[in-house]
Each structure stands twice: as C-alpha cells, then as structure tokens.
C-alpha cells in the first residue's frame, strides 16, 4: 500500500521520513498555498460570506498533485491548530484525494507519529470554520476601513481588526506615561537603606501617628522621606541622618516564619516568549522560529499552544528524570488548570519530547536552540517538583535617638533575610521577574549569625537616595504579548504576525527611550573597620527617569490613525469588543456557534458606519492654529499632519516645518516655543557653492552640506558652531573618504564610499536611506579597490551599523563627594557644598555629577 503524508512545513520531512521508512512518501504544502485575492474583497456576500480563494503557490500544488499519482492513501498532516486545520481543508479541496485521513500529532517522535496514524480521523469542520471566520472578519475590517483612512489621512494606510486594537493598547500606555509625568514631574522623596552586620535593611516609618507608643511603633511601611518646600528642601532627610550619627542601633525584634514558593506551570506560547525575552533578550519572532526548529527536530512538543497540561506519557517520563536526578523527595505531580477559553484545541504544554535528553550540546550546533531547549527542559522538570521551603527572618532594628526622644514620625530599620530550607523546584529553575528592583532589599544566602533581641548591631552604611516616582514601563514585545493574553485579544498563532504588521506599517517602532534628566542628591554614612565614623557625605547624581531600552512606542503616524479610528469606529477598537470576538471564534471552534452568524453581526455593525463616512468629505477637521508672526513677518501656524503635530513657517512660496515634541502639544504651544523650534535648520553660510546648514536632531546638532550629513563630534553648544567650525568638520570627514563608487546592485543604483574609520577601513553603502558599513578584508588594499571587489565586500551578510548618533556622543561626568561631619566635642559646625548651600559639617569637597538610568 502506497501512502503519502502531506505536512505543513518542509522542516519536518527528514525527521518523519526517518521514522516511517521507505513505504511512506512525505511532502510539504509550504504553509498556506491558497488565500484570498489581495486585489479584491474576495468574499461572496450572496453566499453567506464564503471566502473566494485563489492558489498562491501553483508550483507547490503541481508538485503535490504529481506526488499523488499511484498513491492509495493520503494523510493530511498539517499542524493541529486552526491554521493547520484550514491547510488540511485546502489540501482536500485542491488536491481532491479519493482516500484520505486527517493526521494529528503534537510531537515528532516515533510514538507520537505511530499513535497519530492509529487514531487518524477526519478534518474538524468547526476548526476550519473558526479560521475561516477570522480570515473573513479581518478582510472585512481591513478592506472596508482602509480606503477611508487613505482618503482622509493620505498614503497607503491600512487598518486591521486586531492590529488596530494593539496599536491602541500601545498608545494608551504612552498616554498613561505622559499623564503620570505631567502629574508627578517633580514628585521626589528620599528612600533610605542600610547594612547592619552584613544584612540589608530598609528604613520603615511607623503607621502610628498618635503620641509615641512602643507597642505599636514598629508596625509600619517602607519610609519615603519627603522633601520640604523651603530654602532647604532636604532638611528633613539631613536631620534624620544627623540623628543616625548620634544613635546606636539595637535589635528590637526577630521573627521567623516559614513560607513556600511554588513552581510555575510549563510553558505556553506566550510564557515561553516572555521568559526567552527576559532571560536571553530574544524577540518573540526569534523565539518562535527557534522553537519551530526544535519541534521539527523532534526535541519539543508543538510550540503554538495555550495549554499548560502535560500528557500521561509526559508525566511518566518527567517523574523518572526527577527521581533519578534529584531523588524521590523532590517529585510532586502538579496539575495545572488552563486559563484560555480555547485551550482544548492544543492538547499539551510546550515540553521536551525526551526529557532524558538533558541538553542539546553535542546534538546540534545552533546556540539559540541549545539555550531555548535548556529553558524548556528546566521549566518542564521544575513544574513537577515540590515547592521550595523558605525561612523568612524579619529583623527590626531600632534607632536609639528615635526611641529615647520618642520622636514622631518614628523611624526604624527592617531587614528581611531569606534562607532556603528545602530548594524543591528551585534546584532546577527560577522564573525571571519583570522588575528586579522589587527583590533588591532582600538578603539571600546570609551566612552571618542572626543577632538576638536587645543586642547591639554594627552599622556599616546608611544611604539616603533621592528618588522620583517612576512612570509605568512601556511594553516590550514580550510584555505586550502578556497584555494581549490578559485582555483575551489574539491567540498564540497570531501574536507574532500582529506585532510584526504594526511595526512594518510604521504605526509603532521598537526603540530606546532616552528618559528625562533629573538631578538627585545622595546622603551616606559609612563605617570603616567597624568604627562609627561621625560623618555624612553628600553626593549629587543625574538619573535618566523613564529610560528604557528596546520598548515599543507609537509613531506620530500611528497616533494619527488611532485618533481617526477612535473617533469614527470606537466600538471596533474597544478591548472588550475584540476580546468577545475572540471568544465567539472559540465557540465556533467547538461547534457552539455558527460562523456565519458571527460574521453577519459584525458586518451589520460595520457597514452602515462605512457607508455614512464614504458619503462625507473632510472628516479630518483642520486643527490648524495661527500662532503669529516672527520678527521678519513670516506667518507661523501649528497644525496636525499624518506624521504628527508640527509648527510651520511660510517663507515665500515654501513652508519650513518642525515637529512639536513633549511636553509641548498642539493645544499648548505658543509663538515663542514655535520660533525656537523653527530656529533650525540655520544657514551658516556657503562653502564651495553649497549652503552649510546647522540641523538639530534627536541626538543633538549636526551639519547638512551638499546632500550629506556631518557629525560635530564633541560640540553640543550651538553658540560654538559657526561657518569655520562647520568647514573643519566637513573637511575632517572628507579626509577619511578614500574613494567613491557609483554602482548597480540588483538593478538599483547605489553609492559606496571607502572610508578610514576608528576601527579600520570599511565600505559604507546607503540603501533606502539606511546606512550600513562593511569591513574591508585585510588582504585587500583600500586605496586600490575595484568595483567588483566592492560588490563582493557588500554582498557579505555580516554587517555592523554605524553607532555614533548625529551630533556626536554625550559626555558622562564622574561623581565625587561632599563630606559633612558631626564632631564629638560640639553639637554642630558649619559646612558648605559647591552650590553654596549650608549644612552641618566640618569640610566640603567639590561636587560633580554622573549620569545613570532609572
């Protein structure tokens, strides 16, 4: 009997062929090979919204039909989710096999494949309908709304049923951050920490605001010593530090309590994406591609799932590994409950297919596959282990001055020491956390002796650091997936494409957020060689409040599109509406609801709005506002474009534009603000017949000259930039230019420049306004390169991007300390810091700043 197995992806062919042997022919459909015609709506409205498909990969279909000749049985073995079921249906519709069965497996192992063959069935029409409904809903939303966007805003704009809501989520977060900063821009306080006998401690303030009562004084929360609105705003914290100078520190109480920490469930798609991002910095796309390879290699189960269940076979294998590797005392069968409504579609969590394979080192060479497999193995094994037992010791430390004088507010230090009594699952794996700062004040693996109540402890240091209220963090790819999952928007198979799409459409971007510079003050007392030094040191520092790396932020275009959609289609961008639609699709997948009814209801709500808007003109009402005129009589206005809010100045027949940036808005900007924004580009004069323009970018000042940009190096003060300094910068860069080539690459004309840089010779090429640098091999002479050699150099995939931003690099200044001391012979003496503020102390040193991020 001749049998043909049709897979979804070619990466599985080799593994499955090796399992089944020569009697089976194994081919792949290369994913979806038919789709809706992109040039048409491709929906039959007279036939219950039935999609009208076209074959998009005719060569694939031709090859599969050829493979079917002389075949007795065809197994449709696409993946076991909605998309896979739709591909299986497409294979049946297009190839029309006379004898077929639907083959489903979630792991590429011999046992899984043979079991799937034994239990082969039919195509699940409910899953097919659920995928069909999603595809039709997405097409209706995109093809009905996108033309309105293009007509009203301009450009090749498009809307997406899930993508547009995802953009809204990101914009809502950005607005939340802006509102927080506007409300709390200057809200700061001092947070005090200390180290006593080697253990970390945090200052606490008593909740008791009544007259001092020793019985209730030590019931409090982490202290935040506020600044005072006066000539000496830090006096409150300074007075606290002075009292610490005069104090001794005693153990008020020691309390032990036992707690347990339970393991996390095995991975779903979204939790794997989040953890790989936190631990390895992997993008969700990279994570899924790596997991796909592991699945195709037979190392893990299917990677698109929102189930946390493990099969009976999996439990059996995991139990053996735990008892063999760690002992029977560590094993505990844990059953986890699925949260997702449609998790019945994916039968198992992501786990190793052969947990006895502890590592892939020596099996494969790909470092990412090795790392990701280890992570999946650890999480899976840990999920079936006993909870960790941890002894938490809470130590309260009294400050003698506050006890003796019965001061209010009453302060004391509290230390938390965690000792692992039984590691349990933590012997294998500990889940990462999004905010490591929450763990910073806990002393772990403490080896010192726990002091007794009433004993005196050695103060090693006390640090009072000014802190600003931190805005909520922006979304990373992983945390956005988590948010989508929490809201019930999208499914495991859609997360990657959703985020990819809104980035490609330039509605959002992944970027580094520079943060807002804030000057802070730090006071410290340090004890050296266990001697109590009666001195308070003052440092100044500069933090970058809200600085974040690789976060998703909306673009001006995304904000403009979102504003339009929120104005005219608010129901369709509502979180609950979109989540309810996902739930309805889940009901379709189980046969509880009919897909046509869901699409009809959606269409009946959307079509009247589209029809009404299509009749109207000028929906995007002009937001232009006349601000006034500059000194030369040029009219200046503030307006909104598809790229965001701008100010513009009319000079003759042309307009000069400048972006309106935070904290300014279209409504709050004034004429004086606009004049400053429009100050650049500034014409410094001409050099060799071309204008030299001073430009101001996101990273500082730079020059534009003869269609090229030039860095100004360390110069960041516009007052220091004139035509002479500009010419020097231009000539300095040109001195490094060895040769220029006008080439043709893939039918397109490009310009290549041979340069001598800081790290050696390289070729710089600009494609689509993006510069890329290619190192020149050492065996080539950079002064005598041919066009063919240049083309060969720039065809190498490995590149490095030019890292220096326009305007040059920023200088980070180093800190020093100002010392204030409390002498033993007198109660107070005078001291000053470099800013001429006076504090108690005996000496002062020059204070400078450093920049850190927060």
From Swiss-Prot:
Domain Toprim span(s) in chain numbering: 2-110
Site annotation Interaction with DNA: residues: 32, 134-135, 138, 143, 304, 505
Annotated Gene Ontology cellular component terms: virion component
Signal peptide region: none
Active site per the UniProt annotation: 302
Disulfide bond annotation, renumbered to this chain: none
EC class (word): isomerase
Catalysed reactions, semicolon-separated: ATP-independent breakage of single-stranded DNA, followed by passage and rejoining
Compartments where located: Virion
Entry keyword DNA-binding: yes
Ranges where the Topo IA-type catalytic domain occurs: 124-610
Region Interaction with DNA, annotated ranges: 158-163
UniProt binding sites for Mg(2+): 8, 79
InterPro entries recorded: Topo_IA, Topo_IA_2, Topo_IA_AS, Topo_IA_cen, Topo_IA_cen_sub1, Topo_IA_cen_sub2, Topo_IA_cen_sub3, Topo_IA_core_domain
Region spans: Disordered: 802-854
NCBIfam families documented for this protein: topA_bact
Function noted in UniProt: Releases the supercoiling and torsional tension of DNA, which is introduced during the DNA replication and transcription, by transiently cleaving and rejoining one strand of the DNA duplex. Introduces a single-strand break via transesterification at a target site in duplex DNA. The scissile phosphodiester is attacked by the catalytic tyrosine of the enzyme, resulting in the formation of a DNA-(5'-phosphotyrosyl)-enzyme intermediate and the expulsion of a 3'-OH DNA strand. The free DNA strand then undergoes passage around the unbroken strand, thus removing DNA supercoils.
Family of this protein: Belongs to the type IA topoisomerase family.
Name of this chain's protein: DNA topoisomerase 1 type prokaryotic
